[in-house]
Curated annotation (Swiss-Prot):
The chain crosses the membrane at residues 34-53, 54-72, 126-146, 152-172. The gene is TVP23B. It is a multi-pass membrane protein. PANTHER family: GOLGI APPARATUS MEMBRANE PROTEIN TVP23, GOLGI APPARATUS MEMBRANE PROTEIN TVP23 HOMOLOG B. It comes from Bos taurus (Bovine). The keyword Metal-binding does not apply. The keyword Nucleotide-binding does not apply. It is found in: Membrane. This is Golgi apparatus membrane protein TVP23 homolog B.
Length: 208
């Protein structure tokens, strides 16, 4: 697997194909992509259900493991390549330049002033709820499998944590930007808090 370089090789761009834009925009509160919204939750929820219930319906660990891994793989591909782009206008991917150097690209589609908001609020809630909640559940399953000595399931659970955690990390990077932007945001926030506290202390002293 390609790893991100220690140098800042990430790119934050907002380049999406123009053909993906539509002229007639439904209301932002409506679900504009019902099929994408369904499959955004279907594969990841199905993997969790199979993990919890498979031993009740099948005594074959191999069959359960293969089913869960297939569902997790389908979920990873669908969320990374389809649902994120359609539901929230975000996309992350990797490319190799002419020098053979790996670059991670985090895209965020920005609406033009004429179009207004291009992301449905309902779809955004569905997307982020599924994206955050399911990896948290897999982390809980990992601790449960570890402490209950279910060693054979640990590899399956770790696969769930890695695949769904990778999508969560990628889309958070798309949403908030690169490490430089995160540092800038933190510095700006601390500066504002300090300025606000200093201003408040000055006003209090003046009042006395």
């Amino acid at each position: 697997m390609l790893q991100q370089d220690s140098n800042d090789d990430t790119e934050d761009v907002s380049l999406f194909d123009a053909e993906e834009e539509t002229t007639n925009r439904p209301k932002k509160s409506r679900i504009r992509h019902p099929v994408a919204s369904f499959f955004h939750l279907f594969f990841r929820v199905s993997a969790i259900i199979v993990y919890l219930l498979c031993e009740l319906f099948s005594s074959s660990f191999i069959a359960c493991m293969v089913t869960i891994i297939l569902l997790l793989s389908c979920d990873f591909w669908a969320v990374k390549n389809v649902t994120g782009r359609l539901m929230v206008g975000l996309r992350w991917w990797n490319h190799i330049d002419e020098d053979g150097k790996s670059h991670w690209v985090f895209e965020s589609r920005k609406a033009s002033p004429q179009e207004g908001k291009t992301v449905s609020e309902a779809e955004s809630r569905i997307f982020w709820l599924g994206l955050v909640a399911c990896p948290v559940l897999w982390v809980v399953f990992a601790f449960s499998a570890l402490f209950s000595f279910r060693v054979k399931w640990l590899a399956v659970v770790i696969m769930g944590v890695v695949l769904q955690g990778a999508n969560l990390y990628g889309y958070i990077r798309c949403k908030v930007g690169s490490r430089k932007n995160l540092t800038s945001m933190a510095t700006t926030y601390l500066g504002r808090q300090f300025l606000r506290q200093t201003t408040g202390d000055t006003q209090t002293s003046s009042g006395e």
